[in-house]
């Protein structure tokens, strides 16, 4: 991911703060997502707590691999293929990204500066790009 060292630090610091309240943050994330796309709710299991924690675990993998994107690429390729099998489309990633930004704003408060937001947006855009490409999502 073409992120500066400052951006990587902002992402790591933000995720460290988010780790303090992962369960509520993960639920807030899916609430924000389904506010944007209620039509997609049937694609998800009833266990949103578990789904949310899986999302946060994946987010943690991304954060941990900021300096080694080649290691992350294999995992993202696998995830992209899995998402394709579930019927996920490329268009689903934009509202998910906005839900992530909403969640970070709510959880991090003043820590979530415009610069931190730009860093998170850049990282998410690259992850989404890789997922879409590897899953050949339409």
Regions found by a protein language model. Give the residues of each.
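Globin-like tetrapyrrole-binding proteins
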Residues: 1-138
